[in-house]
């Protein structure tokens, strides 16, 4: 029997939470009810989901998708997020690929750590996932005298209409996932 439970696959031995079940049910309903997404969603599933509070009495839904399926999710990202935001009544939906950070190898060991498993690569990948479909066109790091570090991320101005209202959501979600302060902006376009 094909049920919503097949839409979520957790690590061995872990049961999905109640909220994860509702997200899996939403995926299942979209697959069965929405004709344009049906064929695309057939083989896709999620690893987990978390709901978080945002400043200003808003909520965001972070959905973790398998790293290997991220390209398939990116093909339907805009339509899928629009439908999920309707289902979750205005909550901002963010899709993030599940990535692992591996500790650096000990001195003298012959083990080589893949570049994709380093802390920097994982945090950069999460940042790209959070702001998708907009592309990052520039980064600046600002160091305060007290040691704080704030990253300023410039997004592609072509996606301004789709992403401008979500910039606060992006920075809150990234701070929750990576613990880094981030400010999103669009580069100034010169009019000649």
Curated annotation (Swiss-Prot):
Keyword Signal set for record: no
Entries under Pfam families matching the protein: Ribosomal_S7e
Gene designation: RPS7
PANTHER family attached to this UniProt entry: 40S RIBOSOMAL PROTEIN S7 (PTHR11278), SMALL RIBOSOMAL SUBUNIT PROTEIN ES7 (PTHR11278:SF12)
PROSITE patterns for the chain: RIBOSOMAL_S7E
Keywords carried by this UniProt record: Ribonucleoprotein, Ribosomal protein
Cysteines paired by S-S bonds: none
Family per record: Belongs to the eukaryotic ribosomal protein eS7 family.
Highest taxon above the source species: Eukaryota
Keyword Cell inner membrane annotated: no
One GO-annotated biological process of the protein: rRNA processing
Transmembrane segments annotated in the record for this chain: none
Entry's Gene Ontology molecular function annotations: structural constituent of ribosome
Name the record gives this protein: Small ribosomal subunit protein eS7
């Amino acid at each position: 029997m094909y049920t919503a439970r097949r839409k979520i696959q957790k690590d061995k031995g872990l049961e999905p939470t109640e909220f994860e079940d509702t997200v899996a049910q939403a995926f299942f309903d979209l697959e069965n009810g929405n004709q344009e997404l049906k064929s695309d969603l057939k083989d896709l599933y999620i690893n987990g989901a978390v709901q978080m509070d945002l400043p200003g009495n808003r909520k965001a839904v972070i959905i973790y998708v398998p790293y290997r399926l991220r390209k398939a999710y990116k093909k339907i990202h805009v339509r899928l997020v629009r439908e999920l935001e309707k289902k979750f009544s205005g909550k901002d939906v963010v899709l993030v690929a599940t990535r692992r950070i591996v500790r650096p190898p000990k001195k003298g060991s012959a083990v080589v750590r893949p570049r994709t498993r380093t802390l920097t690569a994982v945090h950069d990948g999460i940042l790209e996932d959070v702001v998708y479909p907009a592309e990052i066109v520039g980064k600046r790091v600002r160091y305060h005298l007290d040691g704080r570090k704030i990253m300023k991320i410039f997004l592609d101005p072509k996606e301004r209409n789709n992403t401008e209202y979500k910039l606060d959501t992006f920075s809150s979600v990234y701070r929750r996932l990576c613990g880094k302060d981030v400010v999103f902006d669009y580069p100034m376009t010169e009019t000649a």
